[in-house]
Structures are given as structure tokens and as C-alpha cells.
């Protein structure tokens, strides 16, 4: 009987030590990933001044769209709603550009009817305006690039931007689900 009790005690101690070692290694692994992530962010912060537009504009501190812009050699990405209000952007002050581009798209749409995109060549860059419908919202993606984008790149960029926007909109739908409907009606 004593042997069984000693065995059970040693077994439980062994399992607890094993679980403790496992959690310690997981904690260290997460800490390592966090350190690597912070180094990447710091490197992006160092890189941003070298690729930022020359017009005195600065990139924002959010790196989801900046990563897309850097990977495709794009200067700016601005996402606005149908009223011209900025949803997401790579620039700090993109309100004026977003509102102007969305109004240009709407004006051309009234003139020409059903259009898929608008491409404007200005001085040394291209301005692409794409309509996008996401979760019932009419959005416009405005891309400014010094190089012309081909159709395949456009689709890849829009797909990645849509993925980023889904993250933004998923948090909004989560918040709406957490708030009771009566509270929304009283507001």
C-alpha cells in the first residue's frame, strides 16, 4: 500500500513538473516572438522615413496597410467610406485626399455609368480609385503609386487590403454584438 501511495505522489509531482516546464517554455517562446515583433516594428519605423512621400506627409503608426504599401512599392493607401471619411490609411493627414478622390469617383461614375476603377496620372504618380463593398458599406480604396500597377498586382493588393479591413470591421461587429439592442435604440 505504501508503494502505491509513493508511486502516486511521485507520478503527480512528475506531471506537475512536466506541466510547469511546458508552460515555462511556452512563456519564453511567446516572449521571444514579442521581442522579434518589436524589432520588426522598430525596423519599420526606421525604414518609413526613407520611403515616405516627399510632400511633407508622414505615415501613420499602424503597420497593416504600411506593410502592403512597402511590399508593392506603393506610396499611399487610403480607404474612405462613401461620405469621404477615412477608415484606414497609411498617411497621417489623409482626410482631404480621401474626400477628393471619392468625390472624383462619384462624379466620373455619374458621367460614365458602371465603372470598375478610376486611374489618374498626375505629374509623376498614378492615383487609383477602386470601389469596394464590405459588410454592406460602400468604401473606396485610393492607391497612389509612382509606378503603374498591372491587373494581377491590383487584385492582390485589393485582396490584402480587404483582409485588413475585415479585421477593422470584425471588431465593430463584435462591439455591436456585445451591446444590447435596447441600448442601441436609446442612443
From Swiss-Prot:
What are the UniProt keywords, alphabetically?
Answer: Membrane, Transmembrane, Transmembrane helix
Instruction: Show the GO cellular component annotation of the record.
Output: membrane
Can the keyword Acetylation be found in this entry's annotation? no
What SMART domains does the annotation carry? Robl_LC7 (SM00960)
Keyword Phosphoprotein recorded: no
* InterPro entries assigned: Roadblock/LAMTOR2_dom (IPR004942)
Q: Which domain of life is it from?
A: Archaea
Taken from the record, one Pfam family name reads Robl_LC7
> Any transmembrane segments, and where?
3-23
Query: Where, per UniProt, does this protein localize?
Result: Membrane
Question: What membrane topology is given?
Answer: Single-pass membrane protein
Query: What protein am I looking at?
Result: Uncharacterized protein MJ0163
